[in-house]
Amino acid sequence: MDSKEYLISYGWKEGEAFREGGLKRPILVKHKRDKKGLGNAPGGNDGEAWWERLFDGHLKNLDVSTDSNNGSIKFTQNEAVATAVSKSSSPLYRWFVKGEGLKGTITNLGKKEEASFVVSSASSSKGKKRRRRDEDDNKVKRKKLKKDKKTSNDSESKKKKKKKSKKESKKGKKSKHSSDEGDKSKHKKSKKSKKHKKEESSARRDRKEHI
């Protein structure tokens, strides 16, 4: 179906918009026909060649020479190459599990011992620092546990003392109450005995008067 003829059949003219104030030209779209990533400028640099720079830096630190007698190639490393990011500080490198290296055709015949010594000393110093940090952390944790135990023991002893003081106060109140009741009963008995004596004396007087 031809879209142009279809629109002309409804009264549309070429070069005019469908409505008043509408677009007279179509929206231009840039088609991407290459296989590069999004956001890449056409004709620009595809990316920084970081791998080439790193490879060249490693090659500069290597000394490759041939032996005149045997005709073999000697592979020596002059300096220990330091990485840009330290293994201890990088959070991604901590979870990285290092596997076996790829074996090449060139054997390490004349490798110097100084580079290996530097690497081993650095690794040993890192291990010592980690051990010291772990020991310090353990000491701090032990001190905190001791403080918590002391505070808990002090609180328990205070609670026990409060309970004992409450019990003693209750016992003292009970003893006072019992002593007060005993005094009241004694006072009542003394009053009754006095009344009884008065009645007996009055009865004796009456008997004497009758006689």
Curated annotation (Swiss-Prot):
Q: Where is the composition biased (Basic residues)?
A: 140-149, 158-176, 185-197
InterPro entries, per this entry? PINX1
Q: Which UniProt keywords apply?
A: Nucleus, Ribosome biogenesis
Q: Where is the composition biased (Low complexity)?
A: 116-125
Q: What does this protein do?
A: Trans-acting factors of the ribosome biogenesis process.
Q: Which PANTHER family match?
A: G PATCH DOMAIN CONTAINING PROTEIN, PROTEIN TMA23
Q: How does it assemble?
A: Forms homooligomers. Associates with ribosomal complexes.
Q: What is this protein called?
A: Protein TMA23
